[in-house]
A protein has these predicted regions:
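Acidic, mature catalytic/reactive cores of soluble proteins
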Residues: 1-266
Length: 266
């Protein structure tokens, strides 16, 4: 019932609306003067597993076109920012246009966008956006570091998009988005997932990667992982200590060393 209601009222034609104002006016709609499209609704239509697949594909394509800013190296929360709207969206409008949540990069939402892209198999786009979120890439030279203005070794909660300050980092050292960025890397791209004692491998690597190696220390033991592309492989396959398994998951034994080879299609 809830899913039908969402699809019938929240779909705006090319993306999902963020919500509605108290008077019923849509928020995050193509008819909105400000905040036409918001990333969170698009990302979670994928991550929830409840969005119509065709609609989610269209929505994420539109969000990529409208919210990913290659020049500033940011993924905006929404666009355009609130400025002159007669509707009151709340405290967010108190920020200047392009600052923090008001049309800048809200890094929590940006990490969800990366994970959603990876989940859809749009691995090159996921990696491109992840690279934008990686703080070290905002200080590639002295000029970039001077413009960014904050530490390139911690995650910024927000990055500005406003005129004259676009690309400048905001709040640092105090954001839960650091944990989400870690998950975007380890689970979203490398494809290493832990649920309870079960480890699952679903690599979603960019096309220019041949694979990777990793060492996982858990359950008082060590798991050495090699992921390789293989032309003969049609779907993900897993080998544990040289023996093939029937699935991409296994439960490590406490205190043991395990060698894992994950083969993915080339």
């Amino acid at each position: 019932v809830l899913k039908r209601a969402l699809e019938s009222t929240a779909w705006d034609g090319q993306w999902y609306r963020r919500g509605s104002f108290d008077d019923g006016t849509p928020l995050g709609s193509r008819n909105s003067d400000e905040c036409k499209i918001d990333s969170i609704a698009q990302s979670w239509s994928v991550l929830s597993g409840e969005g119509d697949p065709a609609r989610s594909t269209t929505a994420m394509e539109q969000a990529t076109k409208m919210l990913v800013d290659d020049k500033l190296k940011i993924v905006k929360l929404f666009t355009p920012p609130f400025s002159n709207s007669e509707q009151d969206p709340g405290y967010i409008k108190s920020y200047p246009p392009g600052v923090r949540e008001n049309g800048g990069q809200y890094t929590h939402a940006a990490t969800w966008f990366v994970i959603a892209l990876a989940e859809m198999g749009r691995t090159d786009e996921a990696y491109r956006c992840f690279s934008m979120l990686n703080p070290v890439n905002h200080a590639s030279d002295e000029a970039a570091a001077e413009h960014y203005r904050v530490e390139p070794y911690v995650v910024a909660a927000d990055i500005y998009a406003g005129e004259g300050k676009g690309g400048r980092g905001g709040w640092t050292w105090y954001t839960g988005s650091a944990g989400w960025l870690y998950r975007a890397a380890v689970e979203g791209i490398l494809g290493i997932e832990r649920r309870g004692k079960q480890i699952t491998f679903r690599p979603k690597l960019p096309s220019h990667w041949d694979g990777y190696a990793a060492a996982l220390k858990m359950f008082d033991g060590e798991i050495k992982v090699r992921v390789i592309r293989d032309k003969k492989t049609k779907s993900i396959s897993l080998e544990l200590n040289g023996s093939k398994t029937k699935s991409g998951s296994f439960e490590p034994k406490a205190g043991e060393k395990t060698e894992v080879v994950v083969k993915i299609p080339a």
